């Protein structure tokens, strides 16, 4: 990841070069895992690793799927090479990229899942009001810390760039109060309509959601939104 303070507090941050090399690090790590999963041992020597007769038993009976987040050019390339499922934050520019990729007819190895924050209320107006109230009450100190960390990332075009945006962004575009995750909001019918349109536009294989209150949110989605979806 790019959030250096999370690693520095435990003495685990490798240094500034890791911003640019983290996908190479991850690729080598996956190569080691594949050695262990397919042969049970690894002696792999590489830029980041120096293994000597390492074992991992028992070996899996079937291929283990690789799930990876990837939005920057380097992240997308990593997914192209290694991932079975790719996770993306559903910001408008990302949705446009997915649409272009779908229209191009290019083959892809992995499935794509879009991350959104969901607010479902009885009316569209109430749902928007709830979202805007969260922005008004946002923890500005925490957001400032998050932005300062994101600004250090030298890997351009990834999720850290989305984090740098301000509290002035519309809910749908990924406001900092929601850690740059776009909010899909409205009545059950409106939310279902938006999800169907997004699925058709992007060809996404699925969605991931976060909620203000996950118990209430999951119940509302399952009982009121899911039955209205045509994309499932």
Residue ranges and their predicted role:
Residues 29, 75, 79, 191-198, ...:
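Alpha-helical packing segments of well-folded alpha/beta enzyme cores
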Residues 72, 77-86, 92-97:
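Long hydrophobic segments that form regular secondary structure
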Residues 33, 66, 79, 127, ...:
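Conserved, mostly hydrophobic/aromatic
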Residues 80-85, 176-181, 204-211:
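Glycine- and acidic
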Residues 3-7, 11-62, 91-202, 230-232:
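An alpha-helical appendage that flanks or caps ligand/catalytic pockets
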Residues 37, 70-71, 90, 211:
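Residues that line or immediately flank small-molecule/substrate-binding pockets and catalytic motifs
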Residues 165, 195-197, 205-222, 227:
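Substrate-recognition/cap regions that form aromatic- and gly/pro-loop-enriched pockets
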Residues 66-69, 84-88, 110-117, 205-209:
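Hydrophobic faces of well-ordered beta-strands that scaffold small-molecule active sites
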